[in-house]
Amino acid sequence: MLGPPSREKWSSDFPRWFDWVIETAEVYDYGRYPVKGMGVWMPYGFQIRRRVLEVVRGLLDSTGHEEVLFPLLIPEHLLRRESEHIRGFEGEVYWVTHGGREELDVKLALRPTSETSITYMETFWIKSYRQLPKKYYQVVSIFRYETKATRPMIRLREVTTFKEAHTVHESFEDAERQVLEAIEVYKAIFDRLLIPYVISKRPEWDKFAGALYTIAFDTIMPDGRALQIGTVHHLGQSFTRAFDFRIQMRDERLDHPWQTSYGVSDRVVASLIAVHGDDRGLVIPPSVAPIQVVVIPITPGDEEKRGKVLTYTAKAAEALEKAGLRVHVDDREWERPGAKFYYWEAKGVPIRVEIGLREAEQDTLTIARRDTLEKTEVPLGEAGNRIRELMAQIESSMRERAKSFFGERLLRTESLEEARDWVEGRRGIAEIPWCGRESCGLEMEERVNGKVLGTPWPEEPVEEGKRCPLCGRPAVAWIRLAKTY
């Protein structure tokens, strides 16, 4: 029996593997569109993206979020209203300076994020605490002039799948509760997609510009680099004060409300591809697979027998569709069965059904799992239920494999040298004791040649006697470091 597909290329040369798989599986065309840092979602990739967004939208809608759509252009004076915020983005903003041949009186920014534009409109919409909490979200493109090397889906100048949520609250505590809800929503999203993660409170020097604090989700790529896949920000009153946004409070005084914001992006799809793939291509969780079952007829040369196989194929596909499965029949006559197997394995379709003359005569189906390539034969009458059972097994197996890979790439050590070797060797995320001082945190980044991700969230107590390896002071937290994208 064949074993599961190799992951040697996937792990040893991940950047090249990723470029290969998004092209071969017809997910995302990157590098040929004549603007650096911008790619094109191809039809199959767009379907994966849509399925992922259905998960995101479903969880947000079920927790009282309302979808909106704001303009792409933000006037310069709005973007500059919150000074700390614009300082964090100024070097990355795309500016529109002309309309036709005429220079504009006011420069317009291509949205880098929407805190300023949404807060501005909320000043008109929200007047009283009775309207709170208010939770908006939108799925839009954002633009940032990345000066680092761009990577498809991972580091882009146009982020095309930016889900940003923005909420307004009566008090600091209410906003804090919203942060907790947002974290639970994101945990549910990533758990549904079988993507493992750590949750960290970003250090003060790396929090979102204008936020009181930032909580972030990071996963680990096959090459050992950490990838930020989601962030949640407690904005305090920074933006409501900047816009003099006041509402009537319970005690009838006017005061600034409190806000949060949180976002995920194309990186969710990138991590879905990266975490689960292998050397044959994508491995898509059945719950978000655009096609859950591909049916491939293997037709003999004899015309009568060929007709029998094709008739039975149509019957089988109809039965599987009636069972509620997303089914596609690959009846391309110019492709050999082996080429079709390769094609659909690259696309990560969870289940392949093979139908030849034997299956047509015995009223059975030969079923192959994408994750392990194991084959089994089942009667057509039992196929719907059996495939659903197999898809549940596939998801369980994918979850455990991803969890195992992730767990092997977390190191907790008191040795700065061990942490450096771990991070420089791109083996994953290292945790070491930290005194809490920014100077030590920044020096740790230099010494291990990596980036501080933050401290574990929720906060984890540090055992007595642990000390910062740089200054020798008592440790107040574990600090996470890794190579990042």
Swiss-Prot record:
Its EC number is 6.1.1.15. Keywords: Aminoacyl-tRNA synthetase, ATP-binding, Cytoplasm, Ligase, Nucleotide-binding, Protein biosynthesis. It is an enzyme of class 6 (ligase). GO terms for biological process: prolyl-tRNA aminoacylation. GO terms for cellular component: aminoacyl-tRNA synthetase multienzyme complex; cytoplasm. It comes from the Archaea. Gene3D superfamilies: Anticodon-binding domain, Bira Bifunctional Protein, Domain 2, C-terminal domain of ProRS. It is found in: Cytoplasm. Pfam families: HGTP_anticodon, ProRS-C_1, tRNA-synt_2b. Homodimer. NCBIfam families: proS_fam_I. This is Proline--tRNA ligase. It comes from Aeropyrum pernix (strain ATCC 700893 / DSM 11879 / JCM 9820 / NBRC 100138 / K1). The gene is proS.
